Swiss-Prot record:
This protein's encoding gene: ung
Catalytic activity entry: Hydrolyzes single-stranded DNA or mismatched double-stranded DNA and polynucleotides, releasing free uracil
SUPFAM superfamilies per record: Uracil-DNA glycosylase-like
Protein's cellular compartments: Cytoplasm
InterPro entries associated with the record: UDG_fam1 (IPR002043), Ura-DNA_Glyclase_AS (IPR018085), Uracil-DNA_glycosylase-like (IPR005122), Uracil-DNA_glycosylase-like_sf (IPR036895)
Keyword terms, alphabetized: Cytoplasm, DNA damage, DNA repair, Hydrolase
The family this protein is said to belong to: Belongs to the uracil-DNA glycosylase (UDG) superfamily. UNG family.
The protein, known as: Uracil-DNA glycosylase
Length: 218
């Protein structure tokens, strides 16, 4: 089973075609959209469905130049590490002895190991956070979350912050592990994310299901 098997039907639906039309029209009038067209579906490119072990949900892509590249929380090489990702790194350093905070914010290495880094909205207009939140992406990403839940066993879902936690109803908690906390942003990191041990708990769960653990080092 691969992504095209479970998403082909979704991409034929009217709402999905409207998303693509909207993006094409925005480009025609000269608006800058992030990530670039080639990178919008990178989460699906780097994490194979048959290898998917962990889902980390983000909200919408970074909205400044050279940041977003289709993976939630991740930025391209050579770009400053954003505050939320810096706090994710601090939690990893606190909870995993061998983790050392890297000098970059590119999480492709996680994605290739089976960490699906999904933003619930896949595009954004330059410098306008949440500008594409109502164009239909959440219909698509809700379907993706539900299809992962239905078609895969033993997946770890990390839901950080109120927006991500609202997606819990799409997940069969009897067959998956759902880990919840506050968002790692500086505004809310101390309301539960700091000290959450999610990365340790994820690997403990994967081990209990005889699955390969994630090497969180970057």
């Amino acid at each position: 089973m691969n992504w095209s098997d479970i998403l082909a039907e979704e991409k034929q639906k009217p709402y999905f075609k409207k998303i693509l039309e909207f993006l094409a029209n925005e480009a025609l009038v000269g608006k800058t959209i992030f990530p670039t067209k080639a990178n919008i579906f990178n989460a699906f490119k780097y994490t194979r469905l048959d290898n998917l072990k962990v889902v980390i949900l983000g909200q919408d892509p970074y909205h400044n130049y050279n940041q977003a590249h289709g993976l939630a929380f991740s930025v391209q090489q050579g770009v400053d590490i954003p505050p939320s990702l810096r706090n994710i790194y601090k939690e990893l350093e606190r909870s995993i002895t061998e983790f050392k905070i890297p000098e970059h914010g590119c999480l492709i290495n996680w994605a290739k190991q089976g960490v699906f880094l999904l933003n619930t909205t896949l595009t954004v207009e330059a410098h306008k956070a949440n500008s594409h939140k109502d164009i239909g992406w959440e219909i698509f990403t809700d379907a993706v979350i539900q299809k992962i839940s239905n078609n895969k066993p033993n997946v770890v879902f990390m839901l950080w912050g109120s927006h991500a936690r609202k997606k819990k109803n799409l997940i069969d908690t009897a067959k998956h592990l759902v880990l919840e906390s506050s968002h790692p942003s500086p505004l809310s990191v101390y309301r539960g994310f700091d000290g959450c041990d999610h990365f340790v708990k994820a690997n403990q769960y994967l081990t209990s299901k005889d699955l390969d653990i994630i090497d969180w080092r970057l």
